[in-house]
Amino acid sequence: MSRQIIFGPPGTGKTTHLLRIVEKELRENKVSPNKIAYLAFTNQAADEALSRAISQLNYSTKDFMNFRTLHSLAYRELHLKEENIMSDEDYRVVSDKLQINLSNPNKNTETYGAGFPDDVFMKVIDGAKVRGLTTENFFHDPTVGHLEGGWLKLKYIDTALSQYKTERNKFDLTDLIVEFNKKHYDTVPHFDVVIIDEAQDLSWLQWKMVERIIENSKRVYVAGDDDQAIYRWAGARPEYLINMEGQNEELYRNV
């Protein structure tokens, strides 16, 4: 497996560069478009890459079926349906049962690639998962701060929420990646080419998913800008990008 790490600050044409890689793989290496995965942190980046690829390379959306976010890929590979995803109504039911107002982190995750729950309890529960920690361990992290009711209240909420999901086969978007990472090696999709965009913003949990995907791939391109890691507070681990082994390439602004 070959691996190339591409550092591209804003204004260096990173997306254009990545699409040239796609074109080269299609034209020169004769890779089928459905064997190319372009995986981004946010919907915006995935949608932009897909739109430009279709326009520039004369293919259809169906051809580039693997231009998507990590959450979207996990959702598809787990063979889930919309009713399996925790909705506002699900959180309302749990909130009413516990007499505690819990927010739905899914909306932010779909837009920004990370969940930003409005209430402190969901922040800790989701934050623990993306960091690969137990809820109790993350609760004691100095960055968490004071929670009214302390660990016992948080444990009560976490247990009730987990039970609700298990009984109804429900998942939030972070759970999708947790479950994907449990898949057996043989059931993880195999790609000829994998492109990871916005890698500086990936959490520990998302990096584990990326590692499983690239194990089954022939050529890997990981792109990002460690200076633009704006989601450290939400669990982003840009050091994984910096320390990744492979051939490094740095893009520069045209002057």
Q: Which residues does each predicted region cover?
A:
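P-loop NTPase Walker
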Residues: 1-83
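Short, surface-exposed alpha-helical segments at coil->helix boundaries
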Residues: 47-50, 174, 238
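Short, polar/flexible loop-turn hinges at active-site or ligand-entry regions and domain interfaces
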Residues: 31-35, 56-64, 80-93, 102-109, ...
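Short, well-ordered alpha-helices that flank and scaffold nucleotide-derived cofactor binding pockets
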Residues: 20-28, 51-55, 178-185, 208-215
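SF2 helicase/translocase NTPase motor core
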Residues: 54, 61-64, 69, 88-97, ...
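Conserved helicase motor core of SF1/SF2 NTP-dependent helicases
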Residues: 9-12, 20, 41-43, 200-255
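Accessory N-terminal region flanking or inserted into the helicase ATPase core
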Residues: 1-8, 16-17, 35, 106-195, ...
